[in-house]
């Protein structure tokens, strides 16, 4: 088989396939990029893991335009391509190579959240349920029929990293369950294979398609004139990089809890005593209402207050509760701002 993937999300599937004894004839990943604090050229997590496993790696800048790479991949004669968050659309010349097809593990319940950031958008939109789907790939963006999926509930206090870890494990599991079915159906006429595999066309699943567009830096700005829930969703969905400003420095906000009585059962037990101490919307948005040394900063919003439990001030390390308050030298009545220049 040929494996396609780039971020750490895809590594558990690569590991699972390798550990299960499948012959992986090649791994395709994005080229090395500058990343990290040192802004150094670094291999993608998938490329690094593949090299550690002694697998052959290909890193096309744009597979659609690189006929020589396509020819080299074809020469490997892979029976199937497994794709997890590769990051490029595959052309028909690639999709048609393996006799058992190209199959993608997508981190949403299709047709909801087609595209590059389904995990982030499920959190930003306040979805209570998401999941993973194994989909037969077509030239369109995540439009193919679905072979298998698994639904999961999203917790109120679950951030993008935590949800990603859960879904990446499910992706690996679903591929291990699905590949034997795909192999048993064998190559042949697509319509007959689909019938045998009982794949479901997305238009038959129900629901209008939604698209997870690429996120920009502006999407990461916290506007305290929004509701506490909207701010909380932005913090969780864009973890760890949603940000506000503090004394002309960028303040990343990395863990929050909306102090809403209706959410009491979903809040941390230590946070619940804070409920009801402030009238919703009676204070200027962004104003610090309390510095709770063991919990963090209580900040006013358009609606109920929002508790900031973890943050990272520009030039500092991540900090919780009292340490965060000390780093900011925060006092009641001060204001967090909106970053205008990014």
Curated annotation (Swiss-Prot):
Binding site for (6S)-5,6,7,8-tetrahydrofolate: 108-111
Catalytic activity field: L-methionyl-tRNA(fMet) + (6R)-10-formyltetrahydrofolate = N-formyl-L-methionyl-tRNA(fMet) + (6S)-5,6,7,8-tetrahydrofolate + H(+)
Record key words, sorted: Protein biosynthesis, Transferase
Function (record text): Attaches a formyl group to the free amino group of methionyl-tRNA(fMet). The formyl group appears to play a dual role in the initiator identity of N-formylmethionyl-tRNA by promoting its recognition by IF2 and preventing the misappropriation of this tRNA by the elongation apparatus.
UniProt xrefs under SUPFAM superfamilies: FMT C-terminal domain-like, Formyltransferase
NCBIfam families, per database record: fmt
Organism, as annotated: Prochlorococcus marinus (strain MIT 9303)
InterPro entries, per the entry: Fmt, Formyl_trans_C, Formyl_transf_N, Formyl_transf_N_sf, Formyl_transferase-like_C_sf, Met-tRNA-FMT_C, Met-tRNA-FMT_N
UniProt protein name: Methionyl-tRNA formyltransferase
EC code: 2.1.2.9
Organism taxonomic ancestry: Bacteria, Bacillati, Cyanobacteriota, Cyanophyceae, Synechococcales
One Pfam assignment: Formyl_trans_N
One Gene Ontology molecular-function label: methionyl-tRNA formyltransferase activity
Family membership: Belongs to the Fmt family.
């Amino acid at each position: 088989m040929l494996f396609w993937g780039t971020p750490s999300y895809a590594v558990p599937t690569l590991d699972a396939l390798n550990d299960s004894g499948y012959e992986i004839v090649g791994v395709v990943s994005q080229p090395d990029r500058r990343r990290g604090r040192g802004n150094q050229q670094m291999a993608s997590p998938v490329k690094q893991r593949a090299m550690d496993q002694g697998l052959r790696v290909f890193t096309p800048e744009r597979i659609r335009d690189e006929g020589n790479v396509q020819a080299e991949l074809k020469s490997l004669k892979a029976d199937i391509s497994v794709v997890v968050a590769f990051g490029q659309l595959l052309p028909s010349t690639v999709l048609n190579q393996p006799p058992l097809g190209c199959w993608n593990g997508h981190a949403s319940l299709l047709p909801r959240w087609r595209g590059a950031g389904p995990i982030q958008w499920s959190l930003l939109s306040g979805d209570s349920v998401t999941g993973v789907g194994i989909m037969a790939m077509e030239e369109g963006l995540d439009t193919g029929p679905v072979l298998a999926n698994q639904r999961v509930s999203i917790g109120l206090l679950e951030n993008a990293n935590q949800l990603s870890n859960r879904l990446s494990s499910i992706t690996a599991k679903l591929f291990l369950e699905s590949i034997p079915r795909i192999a048993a159906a064998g190559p042949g006429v697509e319509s007959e294979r689909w019938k045998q595999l009982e794949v479901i066309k997305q238009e038959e699943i129900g629901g209008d398609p939604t698209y997870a567009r690429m996120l920009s830096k502006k999407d990461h700005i916290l506007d305290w004139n929004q509701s506490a829930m909207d701010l909380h969703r932005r913090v969780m969905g864009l973890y760890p990089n949603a940000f506000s400003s503090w004394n002309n420095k960028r303040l990343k906000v990395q863990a929050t809890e909306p102090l809403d009585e209706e959410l009491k059962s979903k809040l941390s037990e230590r946070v619940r005593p804070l409920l009801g101490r402030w009238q919703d919307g009676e204070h200027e948005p962004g104003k610090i209402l309390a510095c709770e040394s063991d919990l963090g900063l209580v900040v006013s919003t358009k609606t109920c207050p929002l508790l900031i439990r973890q943050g990272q001030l520009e030039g500092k390390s991540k900090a919780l509760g009292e340490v965060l308050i000390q780093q900011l030298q925060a006092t009641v009545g001060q204001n967090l701002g909106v970053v205008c220049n990014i």
